Amino acid sequence: SSDVCSSDLIQGFTTISEGLSPEQLTQFLNMYLSAMSDIILAHGGTIDKYEGDAIIAFWNAPTYQNDHAKRAVEAALECQQKLKQMQSQLIAITRRPVKQRIGLNTGVATVGNFGSNKRFDYTMMGDAVNLASRLEGINKQFGTYTMCSEQTMKRASEAGCQLFFRNIANIVVVGRREPVR
């Protein structure tokens, strides 16, 4: 199994980007993406891709990590803390507070080189990836900023994670018949 992290800036990235010059937008995104990426990599994560203001990352591939869920959870919380520390720098560019949503899920994902014989990406696919993305988006409904699946909570706790997890609800997500916790 792998841990998948999906993060996204919130509070109107489109609106923020419309109000910035190309140079300011580049400075803002590079500052944010660099800081978050450094944390993910320090916790043994693999950056899958950047999609605009979003970061997709995973743990437990290409090398095995017996504590991958713990690493992912701790990286997510450190990213939130770092974003708070960076607020004054970011507000100087955006003129508004910047927040992010993070979704974490542990599950089976297919990881490898996907594409054509002319171009391919080392990436991951599968239900675990989709659920992490859905959890990231569901934060908006609950007024939260970091959400993980029950499977991630269990695996992180088993690996010695000392954080407090709060059960919010059984959630029905797009593409699944059964609710997730």
Language-model-derived ranges and their functions:
Residues 43-44, 48-51, 82-103, 142, ...:
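Catalytic core regions of nucleotide second-messenger enzymes
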Residues 109, 138-181:
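Cytosolic regulatory/linker segments at or just downstream of nucleotide-handling modules
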Residues 1-2:
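Membrane-proximal helical linkers
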Residues 58, 96-112:
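A short glycine-enriched loop-to-beta-strand structural element that forms part of the catalytic core
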Residues 5-75:
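Catalytic NTP-binding/metal-coordinating core of nucleotidyl cyclase/transferase enzymes
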Residues 76, 126-132, 150, 179:
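Amphipathic alpha-helical transducer elements in NTP-driven molecular machines
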